[in-house]
């Protein structure tokens, strides 16, 4: 997969399959470039459920459809939520009860972070604490 526009690296997936087999996995930032690539990889690794959380509704629908195409039997669900909203995030965590959380939600563009430092801190620092 070339989702990140970098040279693809091949690696042994058996240990990953063994780890994720039968687990409920939650990915925050699922609609982003890193989060969506992770979701597509997780769809192939045998997890019991893949919950994809993001505040970007259109992107969340897109990755949900892509995951369904990649693995129609996977119990995949969308969670529309902002990681900065602690109460809503906790409600989703309680509902999903994940075995594994992969936190990929972030504002990653440095120039935007410099122009919007409050938003960057709220998402990148408070979001991590909330997760």
Language model: regions and residue ranges:
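NAD(P)-cofactor binding segment of oxidoreductase domains
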Residues: 49-56, 94-96, 100, 115-131
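N-terminal Rossmann/SDR dinucleotide-binding element
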Residues: 1-97
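Conserved NAD(P)H cofactor-binding loop of Rossmann-fold oxidoreductase domains
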Residues: 104-108
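Generic anion/oxyanion-binding catalytic loop in active/binding sites
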Residues: 78, 109, 117
């Amino acid at each position: 997969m070339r989702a990140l526009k970098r040279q693809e690296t091949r690696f042994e997936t058996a240990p990953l399959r063994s780890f994720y087999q039968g687990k409920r996995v939650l990915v925050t930032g699922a609609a982003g470039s890193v989060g969506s690539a992770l979701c597509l990889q997780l769809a192939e690794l045998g997890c019991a459920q893949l919950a994809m959380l993001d505040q970007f509704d259109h992107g969340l629908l897109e990755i949900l459809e892509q995951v369904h195409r990649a693995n129609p039997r996977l119990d995949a669900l969308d969670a529309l939520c902002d990681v900065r909203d602690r109460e809503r995030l906790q409600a989703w965590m309680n509902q999903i009860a994940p075995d594994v959380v992969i936190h990929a939600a972030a504002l990653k563009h440095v120039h935007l972070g410099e122009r919007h430092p409050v938003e960057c801190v709220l998402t990148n620092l408070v979001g991590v604490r909330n997760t």
